[in-house]
Amino acid sequence: MVYDCFCFFNELDLLEIRLNTLDKVVDKFILVESQLTHSGHPKPLHYANNKERFSKFSQRIIHIIVNDFPEFKNITHNKMSWIRENWQRNAIFRGIPKTAKDEDYIIISDLDEIPFRQKQLE
């Protein structure tokens, strides 16, 4: 199995490009979306609100919604932004099944860092 894992904000066109580019080499896409921006402001779930656009991939997308950020009273706003970003990225592991095997491939990258498909086929 090949798992392609990434955080998602609102880049719908880029998501479409990534899914189509990696369609033939990825078994499961793990898309992690937060209900907050890294600055802590509420945001809509753009993937959830546009799921029909990606219906071709619906059986292969594991959509993780992050809404359980830790709160710290004495942390600066800037540091909380980094904490939220890291928390969201670490939530990728919630989508990797416990049945994953040692021989499985897990790709973790930013949405715009699309692996070269030919390399995945090798």
Predicted region positions:
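N-proximal low-complexity "stem/linker" segments adjacent to membrane-targeting elements
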Residues: M1-K24
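Short loop->beta transition adjacent to catalytic acidic/histidine clusters or analogous donor-positioning motifs
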Residues: V2, D23-T37, S58-I62
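Short, thiol/selenol-centered motifs that function as redox-active sites or metal-ligating centers
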Residues: F8-L12, Q35-G40
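Short, well-ordered loop/turn elements at secondary-structure boundaries
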Residues: F9, K24-D27, K101-E103, R117
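Short alpha-helix within the catalytic core of nucleotide-sugar-dependent glycosyltransferases
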Residues: E16-L19, F116-E122
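Active-site-proximal specificity loops/subdomain of glycosyltransferases
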Residues: L36-I108, R117
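Acidic metal-phosphate-binding loop of nucleotide-sugar-dependent transferases
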Residues: D112-I114
